[in-house]
Amino acid sequence: MLAKRIIPCLDIKNGRTVKGVNFVDLRDAGDPVELAEIYSREGADELVFLDISATEERRKTLVNMVRSVAEKINIPFTVGGGISSVEDVDILLNNGADKVSINSSAVKNPQLINDLAQKFGSQCVVVAIDAKQIDGQWIVHLVGGKVPTELNLFDWAVEVAERGAGEILFTSMDNDGTKNGFANEALAKLSELVNIPIIASGGAGNIQHFVDSFKEGKADAALAASVFHFKEIEIKALKQELRKNGVEVRL
């Protein structure tokens, strides 16, 4: 059985980490490279960087950050945010990113998934899906969850997998930020429908939530931000607890 993965997520704006980070020993809480090193040391399996800046300079800034992170850590990392072309991906992968995450651009142009998978291989194509329940249906949303689409989560996930995505990063917007646990029912259904790894996101509040995402949600990986950034959960302790609960992890 493949080990389950724990993935801290960092929001990046203009080359800096945003959304509050509370590491006492940090010289500069806004430095994504320093944070990446700490998480890598603490036992994170992978990292995700989501670029939320919208400046003209963003690509250059992002490339510089990716290069610096790649020099400092030896765990895989994914970069997402504003990626909409083969050229965007080429630049990021050439500068050291292991994977890219696409979201809105995949919905607007599904062929992009095929193109990226064909050119770079499925293993580096992550499709992020943000969804929330409306009248009992899981509906895909865009623009950080502000814009609803006509797409059903499960139909879209199947299409994404068929087009060559290597992984799906599913964020439940109903759970995101609540610290009440992941959307395990939806996660389990996704795992049944597609045979690519599912990364659970949205709702982590305590260690039990991670246990549940793997055991009930059948997730392959679990992603979180604030519980790690604010030291509410230490990755080493989390992994030891997961192992005690019969979840295979790399210690």
Curated annotation (Swiss-Prot):
It comes from the Bacteria. It is an enzyme of class 4 (lyase). The active site is at 11, 130. GO terms for molecular function: imidazoleglycerol-phosphate synthase activity; lyase activity. It holds the Pfam family His_biosynth. InterPro entries: Aldolase_TIM, His_biosynth, HisF, IGPS_HisA/HisF, RibuloseP-bd_barrel. It is found in: Cytoplasm. Belongs to the HisA/HisF family. This is Imidazole glycerol phosphate synthase subunit HisF. It comes from Flavobacterium johnsoniae (strain ATCC 17061 / DSM 2064 / JCM 8514 / BCRC 14874 / CCUG 350202 / NBRC 14942 / NCIMB 11054 / UW101) (Cytophaga johnsonae). The lineage of its organism: Bacteria, Pseudomonadati, Bacteroidota, Flavobacteriia, Flavobacteriales.
